[in-house]
């Protein structure tokens, strides 16, 4: 009887120690409907968030109080602040560069308070500046994870290689589990993918049957990812590429169990 009780207690404890988390990654095309020029998409993106209720979300191509946002929304708009307001989540903006009187870069939403760090990534070939934003997220009272979002260079392979090397270096000694999401602008046959794979697992590959993410009207490539830092126990419950056309990229929804 004592043996049975101990076994049941162990099983209960194991189940209790598993945490399920839902994550969204989405390139939002600077807040504009990709196939309806001049039409805003933030209400649509907020509706998507409210429907699927992710715990964490990473966004790319995010404007903050730019002239471009004013041309679409009639007022200079901080997209992450608006998404946070419309969803009840906590928002964090990571500026990669000054743009049109405001900022342009990455954004995160979380369902719990957190603190964000922003790091500018290297661009040895020049081109558009890029940033990495990440937070220390309280998964439970006793467990924390790191959640990161980025958007790598679309112009030069040398930049992407430097950027993934910098990401690997940034999290090399991080003890909590790390999840990295974003539009990485490379396909699985390229060198940056190989470099990232030395330290991370591609969630869609772990799940099986990875789906194309770009472009929405004619999907030909998979460039939007969730990566899981090696050395930690992640179970990929689901990876969905969602069928929405609010941007030129498809949103990716990931469900994980973390031990």
PLM feature spans:
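Bacterial Sec-dependent N-terminal signal peptides
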Residues: 1-20
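Structured beta-strand-rich core segments of catalytic domains in phosphoester-bond hydrolases
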Residues: 56, 60-144, 240-243
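N-terminal, active-site-proximal structural segment of metallo-dependent hydrolase catalytic domains
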Residues: 15-86, 98-102, 165, 259
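Short, solvent-exposed loop/turn elements at domain surfaces
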Residues: 30-36, 157, 211-214
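Active site of divalent-metal-dependent phosphoester/diester hydrolases
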Residues: 38, 72-76, 89-108, 128, ...
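Structural recognition of the beta-strand scaffold that forms the well-ordered cores
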Residues: 22-25, 56-60, 91-93, 107-108, ...
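His/acidic metal-ligating clusters that form di-metal
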Residues: 131-138, 143-148, 158-184, 191-196
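Active-site metal-binding loops of divalent metal-dependent hydrolases
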Residues: 26-28, 62, 150-152, 182-184, ...
